[in-house]
């Protein structure tokens, strides 16, 4: 078993080589590190000949070794589901060095027609998630010298049609709030805040009183709750745009003051003492964090009891954004308030429906 580090002709890249000629391209320092890793793998008996690695073996190792340390638990969980249910049954036994772009193109076609577990078509959006997962994974396979190039980079995912978003009319908002006020005080206040701020479900669940200044009427988004099989996790926004401050309407502040008083009365009645700034604004009944999935279930039940069309919780965010744009608020301000990475995203979501209205 031989090994060497060398610089290629007319190239500033260095290569670490180990028989059978596995190559890694990068700086000299990176090549030295990779060579040490390869030699350690050989000594431990963990070295796998790249020519014998199947797609399933690589993706399993990539998910456990790379994804586990470089993406959020929720994203890793999603990657594992897509790999297990949508990729491995079709391509798992193929040698990764035999994989070509045409195989991925055929895979996407099969998933669109019958890609669901148990049968049925997958949506173009979900197939797009599969594509992004594979593009990232096979990009690393190419970087690590297992394949010559990333086949997913040569394939276009299926086009996702623009879906119609839910925007509530004023009479629908009024009817919904009137019913919630008498039926469920917590959901009523959540609806008021969502309609006045555009916060996402996870951001509402993670909101603390320390994030709200009732005197200056400001709210600061600092965290979100992520729900995985392992439990709940408070996490910072994915990008700097998600970390944001906004001014709330006086009507929202008024309801939050009433909610603060009611929450403290409940705590005192239970012998828990007065609340603190670190308390959650919208906790569960036992004053533990409210799970996002639980909130969605409770919301669906409450809306179903009202009657009329089913209104999703996320529709309140859409309604908030569309009302701002309709009132003449510039798109950059709306985008920042929603925590979008760019105004282009905001226009892509809300431009078409506003033209129709």
Protein language model annotation of sequence segments:
Residues 223-241:
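Short, flexible, glycine-rich and Lys/Arg-enriched loop motifs at helix boundaries
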Residues 1-52, 239:
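Short, surface-exposed polybasic/aromatic micro-patch for ligand or macromolecular engagement
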Residues 120-132, 143-209, 215, 226, ...:
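Basic, Lys/Arg- and aromatic-enriched nucleic-acid-binding interface segment
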Residues 27, 159, 225-227, 338-357:
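Catalytic-site neighborhood detector that most strongly recognizes the C-terminal catalytic loop/helix
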């Amino acid at each position: 078993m031989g090994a060497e580090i060398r610089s290629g002709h007319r190239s500033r890249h260095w290569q670490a080589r180990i028989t059978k000629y596995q190559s890694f391209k990068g700086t000299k320092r990176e090549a030295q590190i990779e060579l040490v890793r390869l030699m350690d793998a050989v000594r431990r008996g963990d070295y796998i000949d790249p020519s014998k690695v199947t797609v399933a073996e690589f993706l399993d190792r990539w998910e456990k070794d790379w994804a586990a340390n470089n993406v959020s638990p929720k994203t890793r969980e999603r990657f594992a589901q897509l790999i297990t249910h949508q990729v491995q049954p079709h391509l798992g036994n193929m040698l990764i060095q035999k994989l070509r772009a045409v195989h991925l193109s055929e895979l996407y076609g099969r998933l669109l027609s019958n890609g669901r577990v148990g049968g049925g078509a997958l949506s173009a959006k979900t197939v797009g998630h599969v594509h992004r997962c594979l593009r990232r994974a096979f990009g690393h396979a190419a970087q690590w010298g297992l394949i010559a190039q990333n086949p997913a980079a040569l394939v276009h995912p299926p086009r996702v049609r623009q879906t119609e978003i839910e925007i509530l009319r004023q009479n629908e908002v009024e009817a919904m709030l009137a019913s919630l006020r008498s039926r469920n005080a917590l959901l009523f206040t959540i609806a008021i805040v969502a309609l006045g701020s555009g916060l996402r479900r996870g951001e509402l669940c993670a909101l603390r009183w320390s994030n709200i200044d009732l005197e200056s009427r400001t709210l600061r988004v600092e965290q979100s709750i992520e729900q995985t099989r392992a439990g709940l996790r408070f996490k910072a926004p994915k990008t700097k745009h998600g970390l944001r401050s906004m001014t709330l309407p006086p009507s929202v502040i008024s309801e939050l003051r009433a909610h603060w008083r009611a929450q403290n009365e409940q705590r005192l009645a239970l012998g828990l003492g007065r609340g603190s700034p670190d308390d959650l604004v919208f906790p569960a009944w036992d004053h533990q964090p409210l799970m996002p999935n639980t909130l969605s279930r409770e919301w669906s039940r409450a809306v179903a009891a009202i009657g009329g069309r089913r209104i999703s919780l996320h529709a309140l965010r859409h309604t908030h954004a569309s009302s701002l744009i309709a009132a003449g608020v510039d798109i950059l301000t709306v985008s920042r308030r929603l925590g979008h990475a760019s105004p282009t995203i905001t226009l892509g979501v809300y431009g078409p429906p506003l033209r129709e209205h």
